[in-house]
Amino acid sequence: MQSSEVKPFSRLRAYLCPIYKSEFSKFVPLFLLAFFVGFNYCLLKNMKDTLVIVGSDAGAEVIPFLKVWGIVPGAVIVTMVYGWLGSRYPRDTVFYCFMAAFLGFFFLFAVIIYPVGDSLHLNSLADKLQELLPQGLRGFIVMVRYWSYSIYYVMSELWSSVVLSMLFWGLANQITTITEAGRFYALINTGLNLSSICAGEISYWMGKQTFVAYSFACDSWHSVMLNLTMLITCSGLIMIWLYRRIHHLTIDTSIPPSRRVLAEEGAATANLKEKKKPKAKARNLFLHLIQSRYLLGLAIIVLSYNLVIHLFEVVWKDQVSQIYSSHVEFNGYMSRITTLIGVVSVLAAVLLTGQCIRKWGWTVGALVTPLVMLVSGLLFFGTIFAAKRDISIFGGVLGMTPLALAAWTGGMQNVLSRGTKFTFFDQTKEMAFIPLSPEDKNHGKAAIDGVVSRIGKSGGSLIYQGLLVIFSSVAASLNVIALVLLIIMVVWIAVVAYIGKEYYSRAADAVATLKQPKEPSSSIVREAQESVEQEEMAVL
């Protein structure tokens, strides 16, 4: 839907809300849909961590095993189901099917599965595995023992990849034009960050106050879980209504319903035929990545972030679990961290990111994330090593024990890392694709966003599994983890410096090519230059 309004925005309007009046009927439900998707994601993220870390015997050591042996197979199965449904049904039916599956499972877990969890858990099998396997595989044994918690963790994690990445962004990319996307997406990302603030505060408040008292609740944590699950269910129903509204707004009403169904079935069949080709092209994707130093550097940057954030988070959550031993307290703490991540992300996006990149360039913007993670990581591990030796650094001044100070420093490290990732890291990564040719963009994004990021997440878990087998616990392997993190971040910073030089060189070449006098019309040159500038500004 193109806007018929051509009047330019005022400077303030262009900065705060660059949306035409005729576009509000599409933008507002899309913005609200993004908000509720993010809202549910944040609530689920905190609850899944609380369940598996506090509710199990292994603490944070179970997370690396869940990410490899739970999430990876789950993602493969869901992708296959998504492809099967997408090849046979229209996009709205696929959305409703997945929403019904997710909401139905979360409701069923909170109301039925969790109260009878003790009788469902595989205690006898886990006891036998405990006799056979080394102590370092305790996380794997716990994953098997508390299988219902593990499935909840996997389903909550898949909410992000399925509902947010596949369904929501798939819809957004399908119904928005390129010019609309440049103006819509920045505000939609702000909506996602705002949902983090709201979800964090509501989750924290529900841990302190009883919203609705349930007579069948097993304990205080079950009561909190029931209230949060009802919120998730209501939010999901609102999402279904918003999706239906967007779907009806964007379909072409001039086409008769019978022909519209045939057209959607034809598109689904075409998608199925196209999905048979990628296996032949997968090798070309990686060859393309390896043959280009620029794309290989971007892949290393994305891989480094995913490795570093996962290695940091397991250590931090292990420290937090030693302080907050109850479900309600742990969930409340994680909820406050979620709120702070949203606040930092919004403030950084509005006040820092665009201005910093415009003033000091791509390299400085891309260095912000690794430098912030390096400095905060050094402080975090410094407080951990001090706590192990019972040395009080600032604890006496702040009124904290060494362990509490280590957990607090880790929380701030996570807030700053996530905040800079959602702003500086994501935007500079997207900007790095702009000077590339269309072929490099398509192949590079497919390989980096689709495969490399997943390898990074799984790679961090595999590193932990190896260390746990050798050292038996996270605490015993801290020295090695710190060294691995330091090496990764140094490599990350060096690669950013190299890519920065290449980025400016490629950008200058692209502009020089556009300015060549061989072009038949100067207006074409101007339009091409403006399109490049608009693409770069859309990212900022």
From Swiss-Prot:
SUPFAM superfamilies: MFS general substrate transporter (SSF103473)
Organism (species): Chlamydia pneumoniae (Chlamydophila pneumoniae)
Family statement: Belongs to the ADP/ATP translocase tlc family.
Major localization listed first in the record, in broad terms: membrane
Keywords of the record: ATP-binding, Cell membrane, Membrane, Nucleotide-binding, Transmembrane, Transmembrane helix, Transport
GO molecular function, one term: ATP binding
Cellular localization per UniProt: Cell membrane
Lineage: Bacteria, Pseudomonadati, Chlamydiota, Chlamydiia, Chlamydiales
Protein name (Swiss-Prot/TrEMBL): ADP,ATP carrier protein 2
Matches recorded under PANTHER family: ADP,ATP CARRIER PROTEIN 1, PTHR31187
A Pfam short name: TLC
Gene: tlcB
Alphabetical list of InterPro entries matching this protein: ADP_ATP_car_bac_type, MFS_trans_sf
Segments passing through the bilayer: 24-44, 62-82, 94-114, 151-171, 223-243, 295-315, 337-357, 367-387, 391-411, 458-478, 480-500
Cystine connections: none
NCBIfam families: AAA
Domain of life per record: Bacteria
Membrane topology: Multi-pass membrane protein
Matching Gene3D superfamilies: MFS general substrate transporter like domains (1.20.1250.20)
GO cellular component, one term: plasma membrane
